[in-house]
């Protein structure tokens, strides 16, 4: 399995796990057993009343960040990446998704069409410690793990500031990147096909 296949597997695995896990979110083991018995397939339902295979805000916001990163000139500055994240979050918010976390909802609703610097002001809070920032950072974390380029670790950390601006959330995004890098170190030498997942400008980097 080459690196591009591993990256695709991580992204598909994220979405599949989201679609499967949403069925029993917020349920106790006893409630799950009573309602479903054993969940070993993607069946939808749950408190969001999802269709089988439908994903939640976790996957949807992760893809917002991934799209912004792919379209950015991140290697030459941060503004296009962060502005892209903001624009993608707003477009997603306007699509009326079934669920949005409280911190994400507040930031997007209050900062629509404003510069990303104003998002930081709204998101600044030591109490916003949910996983909303972490759930979105998979794509830049993967690219950091595979390439070792610190700019991708920075992207994973900084996109979180748009909705969860505090040191705790920044730390766990950095640690997530480090964990992925450690796990992927064995395949670092087999980079075949990885350039198709990089931002347009970064693909030319060695």
Q: Where are the regions a protein language model picked out?
A:
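Structured, active/binding-site neighborhoods that engage oxygen-rich ligands
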Residues: 1-206
């Amino acid at each position: 399995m080459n690196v591009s296949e591993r990256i695709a597997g991580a992204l598909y695995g994220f979405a599949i796990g989201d679609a499967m896990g949403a069925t029993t979110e917020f349920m106790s083991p006893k409630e799950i057993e009573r309602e479903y018995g054993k969940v070993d397939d993607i069946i939808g339902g749950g408190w969001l009343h999802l269709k089988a295979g439908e994903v939640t805000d976790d996957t949807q916001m992760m893809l917002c960040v991934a799209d912004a990163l792919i379209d950015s000139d991140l290697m030459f500055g941060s503004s296009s990446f962060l502005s892209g994240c903001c624009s993608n979050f707003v477009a997603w918010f306007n699509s009326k998704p079934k669920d949005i976390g409280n911190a994400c909802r507040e930031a997007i609703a209050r900062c629509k069409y404003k510069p990303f610097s104003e998002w930081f002001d709204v998101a600044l809070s030591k109490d916003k410690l949910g996983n909303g920032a972490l759930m979105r950072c998979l794509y830049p974390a993967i690219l950091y793990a595979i390439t070792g380029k610190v700019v991708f670790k920075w992207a994973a950390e900084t996109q979180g500031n748009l909705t969860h601006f505090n040191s705790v959330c920044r730390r766990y995004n950095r640690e997530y990147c480090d964990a992925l890098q450690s796990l992927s170190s064995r395949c670092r030498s087999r980079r075949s096909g990885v350039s198709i997942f990089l931002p347009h400008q970064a693909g030319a980097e060695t």
